[in-house]
């Protein structure tokens, strides 16, 4: 069985502060409530004794083509909430968690946010994908609700002072990828295949190409596709092959990546492959895909499920026992997001009986003062503009 192997931590330019992120763009309350019923009822029972609970909402796609991301975010958060409640809660208060499906759609994500507000959410873990997250930031800003996205990587996902993220931002993924490839001499000629209609993909691409000008390799082909034309990549691959590219950089999601790897193999094209966190999920998320084609694929991602540290092993064991599968980076990001929320609440001293706005003000101030050791980084800190400081890592599929 193939797996990710964390081969080393990437040390980028010493002057660079890395901010880590993940993905790019209905209220399905009955499904979300059903999934979270045990978490909510247990917290409610325990919270009744203390008179109050912290209510954390989550948003992401649990149905549709991006469901692998939203379900991972939901499940990672649920494990963190269960651990926190079992350990006595946050400053003695239990936590309730409710997750809403948005199908990775901006309008539906806003609807999901409104449903969570009606439920009484005080803090938001989400949205999962960038396009949906950007839409929700406008609403959380209006309400002054604290929002931390585990995986929304677009720059605009942290455009307001109440917005924070756990993951890499798109530009910094592109920057770090170009630097790693160049500093380690992985390729001389690189082709890029990216989705010009997607904020995640195009954001990484733009920064990668700009940084490539400073690196000892040449971008010999930059081939785009769009959401309306993402099944046949023969033209893009042929141009990469004809240009002599010995590496193809794929700042895209795993569904399209699987098609590209399959079609490249069929035409006898075998370059090195380098990607980012959007490819996480390719080993188990694509039907009828020959996973042997991923052999040697390199990913810039903050989490490896086969890492040997105690925290990762504990999380992976719990996740497999509860959900029957290996967690991906999005699950780890969301797990960390809940613990970041916990740390900010503890540092600020806010309580559940305070208004959403007062809770947010306290947590915002605390975010630049906390340090969190998590699944996706040790000694993580945050800047006032919402970005996480932590070292990126490279994983190799073998």
List PLM regions with ranges.
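Extracytosolic ligand-binding ectodomains
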Residues: 2-3, 24-397
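Bacterial N-terminal signal peptides that target proteins for export
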Residues: 1-11
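C-terminal motif of bacterial Sec signal peptides marking the signal peptidase cleavage site
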Residues: 18-22
């Amino acid at each position: 069985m193939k797996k990710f192997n964390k081969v080393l931590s990437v040390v980028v330019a010493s002057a660079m502060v890395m901010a880590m992120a993940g993905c790019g763009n209905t209220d399905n309350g009955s499904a979300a409530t059903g999934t979270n019923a045990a978490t909510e009822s247990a917290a409610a029972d325990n919270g009744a004794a203390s008179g109050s609970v912290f209510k954390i909402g989550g948003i992401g796609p649990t149905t549709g083509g991006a469901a692998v991301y939203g379900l991972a975010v939901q499940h990672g958060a649920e494990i963190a909430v269960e651990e926190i409640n079992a350990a006595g809660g946050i400053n003695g208060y239990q936590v309730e968690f409710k997750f809403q499906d948005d199908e990775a759609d901006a309008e539906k994500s806003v609807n999901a946010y409104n449903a969570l507000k009606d439920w009484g959410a005080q803090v938001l873990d989400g949205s999962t994908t960038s396009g949906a997250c950007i839409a929700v930031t406008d609403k959380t800003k209006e309400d002054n609700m604290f929002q931390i996205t585990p995986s929304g990587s677009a720059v605009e996902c942290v455009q307001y002072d109440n917005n924070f993220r756990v993951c890499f931002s798109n530009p910094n993924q592109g920057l770090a990828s170009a630097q790693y490839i160049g500093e380690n001499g992985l390729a001389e000629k690189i082709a890029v295949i990216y989705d010009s209609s997607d904020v995640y993909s195009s954001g990484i691409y733009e920064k990668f190409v700009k940084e490539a000008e400073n690196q000892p390799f040449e971008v010999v082909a930059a081939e785009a596709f769009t959401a309306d034309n993402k099944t046949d990549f023969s033209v893009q691959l042929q141009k990469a092959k004809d240009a002599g590219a010995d590496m193809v950089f794929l700042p895209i999601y795993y569904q399209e990546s699987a098609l590209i790897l399959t079609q490249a193999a069929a035409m006898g094209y075998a370059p090195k492959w380098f990607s980012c966190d959007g490819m996480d999920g390719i080993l188990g998320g694509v039907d009828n895909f020959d996973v042997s084609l991923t052999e040697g694929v390199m990913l810039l991602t903050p989490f490896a499920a086969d890492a040997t540290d105690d925290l990762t092993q504990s999380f992976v064991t719990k996740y497999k026992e509860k959900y029957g599968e290996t967690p991906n980076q999005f699950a780890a990001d969301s797990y960390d997001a809940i613990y970041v929320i916990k740390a900010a609440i503890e540092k600020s001293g806010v309580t559940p009986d305070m208004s959403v706005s007062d809770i947010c003000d306290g947590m915002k101030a605390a975010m630049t003062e906390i340090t969190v050791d998590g699944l996706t980084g040790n000694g993580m800190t945050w800047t006032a503009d919402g970005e996480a400081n932590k070292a990126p890592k490279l994983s190799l599929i073998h």
